[in-house]
Amino acid sequence: MLLRLYNTKTKSLSEVKNFSDIKVYACGPTVYNYAHIGNFRTYIFEDLLIKSLRLLKYNVNYAMNITDIGHLTGEFDEGEDKVVKAARERGLTVYEISRFFTEAFFCDCEKLNIVRPDKVLIASEYIASMIEVIKVLEQNGFTYFVNGNVYFDTSLFKSYGQMAGINLNDFEFSSVSRVEVDPSKKNKSDFVLWFTNSKFKDQEMKWDSPWGFGYPSWHLECAAMNLDCFRSTLDIHLGGVDHIGVHHINEIAIAECYLNRMWCDIFVHGEFLIMEDEKMSKSNNNFITIQDLETNGFSPLDFRYFCLTAHYRTQLKFTFNNLRACKVARKNMLNKLTAVFSSLNQFDLLLLSKNYENIESVLEKRYYDSFLEKIAFDLSIPQALALLWDIIKDDNLSALSKLRLTFKFDEVLSLGLKEGVFREIEKDRINIDDAMNSLLEERRLAKIRKDFKRADEIREYFYSKGFVLIDTEEGTKVKRG
């Protein structure tokens, strides 16, 4: 089954046709602070895409960058390096800051069940590749050097800004109008490829280059690391909608002028998580971290469930009330699945351990195919989540089928359902001592001779000790009350 995704370049759905080697790149974090839940909404959407591709039998090569240099506080080459600024404020070196927040990022990803990329590209480790890209662009006539910086001349790249619908004649710095336009530029839309000592003298991370001792721009980093990692073209590029109007159109300009051909087929962008009608932003001091959620009594997977309730191309409004509702929903789902699991016999438990494809069931397969159709249609995850609830509630499905489908779907949804069910089962497991076993046997015999008073007395005794007796066809089960 082919995956279709909304392609920002074409403003339409594009089919992902190459099953054998899909090259996917995602813009990763700038490691100067903790990633916030607005960032993680994007990373969760990207995680859902990677896992959907794999469930649909695509062979995926997935890379993500870590920006530890060159990402300025202004998007248009203005301001100072975010990592340097954070290091100065905390009294640490830039290397200490970037290492600490890189580890913190992947720790949070693990809590959210976000898969680690096949390749993690650290920007400061690819300086040679970045210099090589500038050299080729320079040879091809796309750069100019002024006031100590190497600029990309956007007027020479005829399709510059097309993905964002930008007309160079009308180009304005609307998102940062408070910033004075650099008078060194030939065109307003030109951007820096390499900064030297002429700017930001406190920059700690610098390297020698043919243009002077300096450091690369954020836009160059992503393009150069892509080209180094995948050696040529890219199938899918991922990021947030805030990347469309500056970062990604600059990446396209660099890569296509370097390759002298089209670089990336499909660009996919996730929408904002908003708070009080504004996007969540570290620069606006308007953000919540995963640690903040945990402090307030939420599991990171409650937040993941929350993100699954909205399509990745729609804005999602965050409130703690909404998150609380998702916490309750996920808990209810786990409780229902735990009850289903408790009803399995030993033969079902054995079958549950087998691969999904080995068991035939018409209704089960219908649900499975429906799930694939939903994720294959532009990641219709809210509909896939609703389908999971339908499965849990469907009395025509056996307990075995419900669990097999749920655990298979959770390979994409990643709500920790299998692990959660096993934890609940383990919590309910009771170590019965000899005295309790004797009482259970006494109660069994009392019921046979219809001494229900004694049977109820024993039930009440267990209840007073924090246990509940559940009578089934297979005998009496003991659970914690």
Curated annotation (Swiss-Prot):
Belongs to the class-I aminoacyl-tRNA synthetase family. Pfam families: tRNA-synt_1e (PF01406). GO terms for cellular component: cytosol. CDD domains: CysRS_core. Transmembrane segments: none annotated. Keywords: Aminoacyl-tRNA synthetase, ATP-binding, Cytoplasm, Ligase, Metal-binding, Nucleotide-binding, Protein biosynthesis, Zinc. The gene is cysS. ATP binds at K282. GO terms for biological process: cysteinyl-tRNA aminoacylation. Its cofactor is Zn(2+). Zn(2+) binds at C27, C222, H247, E251. InterPro entries: Cys-tRNA-ligase, Cys-tRNA/MSH_ligase, Rossmann-like_a/b/a_fold, tRNA-synt_1_cat_dom, tRNAsynth_Ia_anticodon-bd. A motif ('HIGH' region) lies at residues 29-39. This is Cysteine--tRNA ligase. Binds 1 zinc ion per subunit. It is found in: Cytoplasm. SUPFAM superfamilies: Anticodon-binding domain of a subclass of class I aminoacyl-tRNA synthetases, Nucleotidylyl transferase. GO terms for molecular function: ATP binding; cysteine-tRNA ligase activity; zinc ion binding. Monomer.
